[in-house]
Regions:
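Positively charged n-region of N-terminal signal peptides that target proteins for export
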Residues: 1-7
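Bacterial N-terminal signal peptides
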Residues: 9-19
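Sec/Tat signal peptide C-region and signal peptidase I cleavage site
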Residues: 18-26
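N-terminal secretory/targeting leader peptides
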Residues: 26-116, 124-125, 131-329
Length: 329
């Protein structure tokens, strides 16, 4: 065999080996969520996707499925459990039945503002919740802002404590949330987000409660008249991964994944306040009647729901709740 043919054969063989090795090393993960494409959390996941590929030189990439492409929040949690997807980004309430300790950051009227809320979740409180999630097979990758939740309804403006009486309000599957609305005399109903629009349109529900950004992206203004700024709960979005699938990644890829997600979470938090204000203004412009809650009524609502803290302590113990209250003080 000529020297040229031997050299050419060696180059071809080397190229094949390198291509095979590169292919074997490349991995792709899938992450699913129920937030619309327009929501800041979904945009943040696209930042994560780009950053992850850049950090790993394309050796670890991600496919992102927002807007319930792979099902709703419950289905996404089940998919993480089964290993069908690497992770999900969802409101923490959808994990609270698996990890009830998450309700410790769902206390009514607990946070004065988003800065205080993130001070708490970024403290030892977050570490304690992460440990509880890990026990159930979930690795926490970060907490984004879902935001202050506000009530909409079709019955009447909410200008007093009495105005909440008897309202059929859709809630998330979070027992602390449900108990809080029972305490103010409302009739809360847990329901998946997919059914809420039609339920309000048909009069099965009087209203619902969500951050302004969700009310806007779900177009609830089309079937709701009255908008308020109750801000009764501050809600987080947790990015949770399958412990088994996360641990199957190399140490370098785990580090890259966490670093990419940290950048995405920081970006989303920086945009959330702007998104919140813009969404509220858009809802009012669309024709909703906006009635701000007075300081006096807010104080009455807080007083009416104060017993929820004691009930939750009986359910999950005092340690995490006391840690939350300590950070708040």
């Amino acid at each position: 065999m000529s020297t040229f043919l031997r050299s050419f054969g060696a180059v071809v063989a080397t190229t094949i080996v390198l291509a095979s090795t590169s292919g074997a090393q490349a991995e792709k993960i899938r992450i699913a969520g129920n937030f619309s494409v327009e929501h800041s959390s979904s945009k943040a996941m696209e930042i994560f996707k780009t950053e992850l590929s850049n950090l790993t030189g394309g050796k670890l990439t991600a496919d992102i499925f927002p807007a319930m492409q792979l099902g709703g929040a419950k289905e996404n949690v089940d998919q993480v459990r089964s290993g069908a997807v690497m992770g999900t980004w969802i409101g923490i309430s959808y994990l609270s039945r698996t990890v009830p300790e998450l309700e410790a950051v769902s206390l009514p009227f607990a946070f004065a503002n988003r800065e205080q809320a993130f001070k708490v979740i970024d403290s030892k409180v977050g570490n304690m919740l992460n440990a509880k999630l890990l026990e159930k097979g979930f690795v926490t990758l970060g907490y984004m802002e879902l935001g202050s939740r506000n009530v909409t309804n079709n019955k009447r403006p909410l200008k007093s404590l009495e105005d909440f009486k008897g309202l059929k309000i859709r809630m998330q599957p979070n027992e602390t949330h449900l108990a809080s609305f029972r305490a103010i005399g409302a009739s809360p109903t847990p329901m998946g987000i997919k059914e809420v629009y039609s339920a309000m349109q048909q009069g099965v529900l009087d209203g619902q409660e969500n951050p302004f950004s969700i009310i806007a992206t779900k177009r609830f203004n089309e079937v709701q008249k009255y908008l308020s700024d109750t801000g009764h709960f501050f809600d987080f979005i947790v990015v949770a991964a399958s412990k088994k699938k996360f641990n199957s990644l190399s140490a370098d890829n785990q580090t890259a994944l966490r670093k990419a997600m940290a950048k995405a979470v920081a970006w989303q938090r920086s945009k959330a306040a702007e998104e919140d204000t813009a969404s509220r203004d858009a809802l009012v412009k669309s024709g909703m009647q906006f009635d701000p809650i007075s300081a006096n009524v807010r104080a009455q609502l807080k007083s009416a729901t104060s017993g929820v803290v004691g009930d939750l302590k009986k359910k999950i113990g005092t340690e995490i709740i006391d840690a939350v209250l300590s950070e708040l003080n």
